[in-house]
Swiss-Prot record:
Residues 181-191, 211-220 have a biased composition (Basic residues). HAMAP family: IF_2_B. Residues 1-239 are annotated as: Disordered. It comes from Lactobacillus delbrueckii subsp. bulgaricus (strain ATCC 11842 / DSM 20081 / BCRC 10696 / JCM 1002 / NBRC 13953 / NCIMB 11778 / NCTC 12712 / WDCM 00102 / Lb 14). This is Translation initiation factor IF-2. Residues 158-169 have a biased composition (Low complexity). Residues 194-208 have a biased composition (Polar residues).
Length: 825
């Protein structure tokens, strides 16, 4: 074997110098010496590094002043030691090469025994686990041939189970043994924590890596048992299921007892591409249910914020309740203004309410209960003025019977017709009371004929409408009217369930300084108690106090009973529905949700400028407007005033209601009016002391009214005052030119005679020649003889000049005129 082959063989097999005979013993000694030198060198290096690190760490902890100098000296000493050890290592390598050459020269054919490694049975690729570690090289063809040749010889004792190192062969000398025959770790004996491969330059974690390797080998040898995954048993499909729009495959999988992947696959087969988290629409869910052969029912959520729906459900439930009892009828008195509605109510209640009303007219809805013998009747008094149309409509909606008051001496009037229409639209029976029969000019037959034109036919004429002649002032016919009201109520069979949750309707609402938001409510079903959590329109709260129509506080309100309640967070609107909830938390959530919905509707109602309404918008913006901050005592009056102001028709001017509310005029109202240059109108309210002084300082005009038509007239006058003044030409005199003079620096002077009327120094003048207007201008100067005069009347001569005109001739006619302002109608 050549030297080159021997070197290759020794590198591949890792020479076992223990079994080499002859001079190879010297080779073993020299290799061991080299290894000892290297270990010693490596140990010194590691000790030097350790000492340097420990010294550096201790020095940094103690913060000695000369730490940097000591560290520098240690580094220099370490570099010197490393250089010396490198020289010793090179010398040892050279000595080893020389001894190897001598051994080859002395023996013509060195005996090299193959060291066979203990090979484990081959594992299949499927069984062999993946272990992180060094890459194992595939043996070369030369090594395979050598393995076959040596397999015939007796096997040598394996040196190690470690894989051959790729380092030079001189490092493959056997490890030194201790007295017990065990291999001891490299490095200094007795030192703990030294790496077993420190001489090969491995890191501090090599022990851990070796432990992992041994562990992995154990796992390789042990048979691997795969864990069996428990298969999910498919439960049977339900016959039907409830779904919500927006559910995904995971949600449906839980309901249908199927994997989401199966849902996705089935929809894919149906031509619908989805993933597990995609929200599904109604059609997709129903298509999936049809494919499975089951029924899909959409789940309907009840909107608790829809109190109108709750109100209707409660009313329907009360009709089928077993706890129904007879309730008092609700009677609304309607008619034209000054026909005696409130006077009739005063007669029934034995009060004098009409004497205390401003202007003698009712301007809000009043609710009262009157006991007739052993029966209670609830009366609603509605305004008769044209401005209170919405109030009359609300009164007709919550009533059971309408008593239509018509004055016998006045007959059917516009508000009478309107009241008839409201009652018919609400489907409420009408009882006609022809009032003021004590007047000399009373003519009930004429009134009956008028009402028959509106399909109100009396019973004696074959109709079904009850007619009663009364006098609210003297009390004539009042008992007959009450008997007919009770008879009509018995025919209607009015009942209610007092044990259910209360529902009602707001008759009026206002803001009281001492009580806060106050609402007059008519209870229609159930019983309202103090402390009940309620929602009223867009407001919510808990009933704090309840006061009846006589001013007494009560603990509960039964059906058909009008009460004044407090405890709301804001002033509700008239005709808002009242609903009682189980707890205050739910009531608050519903009230806040409704307030948010109302705000959203207001935003949606804002009209945006488009090409279609651009012209109307420009026209509206070019119009002048009267800005008003409106405050009233009750919500119904504020609503009626706002509607009346909007109906005022003055060409070129419109009313802009900046803010409308209830309660006293406060500082915020004055600040708002000052910022927007608006007028404050108060109806049955007064400004606070601070608001009054602030308005005086900022020059804000506050107008206070107690009669609605006076407020309407003043606003109309203000609108007319904002119009540009219009002028009309008026001829005031005629003159004839008798003589002319031309004067330098002055021009032509006309001597004229005033035929009729008069001429002034500020009047306009026209020069007419042969029936044609030659010039239209102004009088420049007017004199009589040598005196300047302001006016010359008919029958007198005068001299005058015309501005910028000198072509005046004898015989010309002069026409004097002036522009007069025309007041808007």
């Amino acid at each position: 074997m050549t030297k080159k082959q021997e070197n290759e063989t020794s590198k591949e097999l890792g020479m076992d110098n223990k079994k080499t005979s002859g001079k190879s013993g010297k080779l073993k000694i020299s290799v061991s010496a080299i290894r000892k030198g290297e270990k010693k060198t490596e140990g010194k290096r590691s000790n030097t590094r350790r000492r340097a690190n420990n010294h550096s760490n201790d020095h940094s902890k103690r913060r000695r002043p000369a730490a940097q100098d000591l560290l520098k000296d240690l580094k220099q000493k370490q570099r010197a030691d490393e250089a010396r050890l490198d020289q010793e290592s090179k010398a040892a390598k050279q000595e080893y090469k020389k001894s190897l050459n001598k051994a080859e020269a002395s023996e013509s054919k060195p005996v090299v025994k193959k060291v066979e490694s203990v090979e484990k049975p081959a594992e299949t690729a499927a069984e062999a686990p993946k272990v992180r570690g060094p890459k194992i090289l595939k043996p070369s063809p030369a090594r395979l041939k050598q393995n076959q040749a040596n397999s015939e010889k007796p096997a040598a004792k394996p040196s190690s189970s470690r894989r051959p190192s790729s380092r030079p062969s001189f490092t493959e000398a056997p490890m030194p043994e201790n007295k017990e025959g065990r291999r001891r770790k490299s490095g200094k004996p007795g030192r703990k924590g030294q790496n077993s491969y420190a001489d090969q330059g491995r890191g501090a974690n090599s022990n851990r890596s070796e432990q992992r390797k041994r562990k992995n080998k154990k796992h390789q040898s042990a048979p691997q048992v795969k864990k069996q995954v428990t298969q999910r048993k498919d439960r049977p499909l339900p016959e039907s299921f409830e779904y919500e729009v927006g559910m995904n495959a995971q949600d449906l999988g839980k309901i249908l007892h199927r994997e989401p992947a199966e849902i996705v696959k089935k929809l894919f087969m149906l031509g619908i591409m989805i993933n597990q988290n995609l929200s599904l629409d109604k059609d997709t869910i129903e298509l999936l249910a049809a494919d499975y052969g089951i029924e899909a029912v959409e789940k309907v959520h009840e909107d608790i914020s829809d109190i109108d729906n709750i109100f209707a459900q409660e009313m329907e439930e009360s009709k089928n309740s077993e706890n129904q009892v007879v309730r008092p009828p609700v009677v609304t008195i309607m008619g034209h203004v000054d026909h005696g509605k409130t006077t009739l109510l005063d007669r029934l209640r034995h009060t004098r309410v009409s004497e205390h009303e401003a202007g003698g007219i009712t301007q809000n809805i009043g609710a009262y209960q009157v006991r007739i013998n052993d029966r209670l009747i609830t009366f609603l008094d509605t305004p008769g003025h044209a401005a209170f149309s919405s109030m009359r409509a609300r009164g007709a909606e919550i009533t059971d019977i309408v008593v239509l008051i018509v004055a016998a001496d006045d007959g059917v009037m516009p508000q009478t017709i309107e009241a008839i229409d409201h009652a018919k639209s609400a489907g409420v029976p009408i009882i006609v009371a022809i009032n003021k029969m004590d007047r000399p000019g009373a003519n009930p037959a004429h009134v009956t004929e008028q009402l028959m034109q509106y399909e109100l036919i009396p019973e004696n004429y074959g109709g079904s409408t009850i007619f009663v002649n009364i006098s609210a002032k003297t009390g004539m016919g009042i008992d007959e009217l009450l008997e007919n009201i009770i008879l009509e109520a018995d025919m209607l069979e009015l009942k209610a369930d007092p044990k259910q949750k209360a529902i009602g309707t707001v008759v009026e609402a206002r803001l009281s300084r001492g009580k806060g938001p106050v609402a007059d409510v008519l209870i229609q079903q159930g019983t309202l108690r103090v402390g009940d959590p309620i929602v009223v329109g867009d407001t919510f709260g808990r009933v704090r106090t309840m006061t009846n129509d006589k001013g007494h506080q009560v603990k509960k309100a039964t059906p058909s009973m009008p009460v004044e309640i407090t405890g709301l967070n804001d002033v509700p609107e008239s005709a808002d529905k009242l609903v009682v909830f189980a707890d205050e938390k739910t009531a608050r959530a519903v009230g806040e949700a409704r307030a948010q919905q109302s705000l959203q509707k207001q935003r949606e109602n804002v009209q945006h400028v488009t090409l279609d309404n651009l012209f109307d918008t420009m026209k509206r913006e070019s119009m002048k407007s009267v800005d008003i901050v409106l405050k009233a005592d009750v919500q119904g009056s504020a609503e009626a005033l706002a509607q009346s102001f909007q109906k005022i028709d003055v060409e070129g001017v419109r009313v802009n209601i900046i803010h409308s509310g209830v309660g006293a005029i406060n500082e915020s109202d004055v600040t708002l009016a000052s910022a927007s240059n608006a007028l404050i109108i108060g109806f049955n309210v007064r400004p606070t002391a601070t608001a009054k002084s602030q308005a005086a300082q900022e020059g804000v005009d506050i107008r206070l009214y107690s009669i609605i038509y006076k407020a309407i007239d003043d606003v109309k006058a203000a609108m007319q005052g904002m119009l540009e003044p219009t002028y009309e030409e008026k001829v005031i005199g005629n003159l004839t030119v008798r003589e002319t003079w031309k004067v330098s620096k002055i021009g032509t002077i006309a001597g004229a005679f005033v035929d009729n009327g008069y001429v002034t120094r500020e009047s306009g003048i026209r020069v007419i020649r042969d029936g044609v207007v030659k010039y239209d201008g102004k009088v420049a100067s007017l004199r009589r003889f040598k005196d300047d005069v302001k006016e010359v009347k008919a029958g007198f001569d005068c001299g005058l000049t015309i501005e910028n005109f000198n072509d005046i001739k004898e015989g010309d006619e002069l026409e004097a005129y002036e522009m007069q302002e025309v007041k808007p109608s």
